[in-house]
Regions:
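Zn2+-dependent metallopeptidase catalytic core
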Residues: 47-81, 85-88, 92-101
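Bacterial Sec-dependent N-terminal signal peptides
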Residues: 1-23
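Active-site recognition of the HExxH zinc-binding catalytic motif
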Residues: 148-164, 178, 182
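Acidic/histidine-rich, surface-exposed loop or edge segments in extracytoplasmic proteins
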Residues: 32-51
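Short pre-active-site segment immediately N-terminal to the catalytic Zn-binding motif
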Residues: 128-149, 163-169
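Post-HExxH zinc-binding segment in Zn-dependent metallohydrolases
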Residues: 168-207
Length: 297
């Protein structure tokens, strides 16, 4: 039976086509990979053991954190592939995704490749300036971005497969996965968020989006364009920061209660905002107002 595969591109879920679980397994098995045993079976392009081990370590630790907290059991596999072995049959190199119990991550890229892949030329000058001011390296920033989004992808697995929640729209589906990731990093590896937050701040403040409304995100999704889509995700990080101050470790359990899988209700953005703001004193509404002001003249 064929199942629709959903891909996330730095948090981006795109339904590309119907690909059976066995086909995804076959595509990965066609690659010549080495393997790391452990709690999470990890397959990687030869020559990239170090980064594969880093991904395996952080994903394993995040799984332990959430299994202990939620009394659930994760069952995922990890593929870490370079540009030559990337699953171009599914999506171009540079994008990480979750599908059918696989977390598919790349082995990284240099700064030039990062800027070009994600269309960040217009904010490069500000990125350079902030990296220099903060005494952080571009390599550290890129690594932190992929680490954070590796757990974001794990969040999609958790919310979709293991939780009692059903995200009411694309916006909630994405920021809830980022919350899942950030809760782990806030509590276990807070320093890893420093250069990630630097990037999100520069992207949020200096990229000029064509689209900035929640309705645009829900309707156009990937169609907003990769740079604009990434800008949305950078903004989602700051929404998560607001929400964490309100909910801390209780957000996901509250999310399950407010947006249960059994629900058949169609919620508007206003409905969702009111629900989230029950404990946040209007901060979510304020965040949306600021977000949507970016394209208002």
């Amino acid at each position: 039976m064929k199942a629709k595969i959903q891909l996330t591109t730095i948090g981006l879920i795109i339904s590309l086509c119907s690909i059976a679980q066995s086909k995804l397994d076959s595509l990965i098995n066609l690659r010549t990979t080495d393997k790391l045993d452990g709690r999470i079976q990890t397959y990687y392009t030869p020559g990239h053991k170090d980064i594969a081990l880093e991904f395996q370590t952080v994903v394993t630790d995040a799984i332990k954190y959430y299994e202990s907290k939620n009394s659930v059991q994760f069952n995922v596999k990890l593929a870490v592939l370079d540009s030559n072995q990337w699953l171009k049959e599914i999506y171009p190199y540079g994008f990480v995704f979750y599908s059918n119990d696989w977390l598919v991550l790349n082995t990284g890229m240099d700064y030039e490749g990062f800027i070009n892949t994600y269309g960040l030329q217009t904010i490069r000058q500000q990125l350079d300036k902030e990296l220099k001011r903060s005494k952080l390296t571009a390599d550290d920033m890129i690594k932190s971005i992929f680490m954070v989004y590796s757990i974001h992808e794990l969040g999609h697995y958790f919310i979709g497969r293991l939780s009692k929640a059903k995200s009411p729209d694309k916006w909630t589906n994405e920021f809830s996965a980022t919350y899942f990731s950030c809760e782990y990093f806030y509590n276990k590896r807070p320093r890893d968020l420093e250069s990630f937050e630097l990037f999100c701040q520069v992207d949020k403040d200096h990229y000029s989006p064509k689209y900035s409304s929640i309705s645009d995100f829900n309707e156009k999704y990937a169609g907003t364009g990769i740079a604009n889509y990434l800008w949305y995700h950078s903004n989602f990080y700051f929404l998560v920061k607001h929400l964490y101050k309100c909910y801390e470790k209780e957000f996901i359990s509250n999310y399950e209660k407010e947006f249960p899988k059994s629900s058949t209700s169609r919620l508007s953005t206003t409905d969702i905002t009111d629900i989230l703001d029950k404990n946040c004193k209007g901060q979510v509404r304020q965040w949306i107002t600021e977000l949507e002001s970016k394209t208002k003249h």
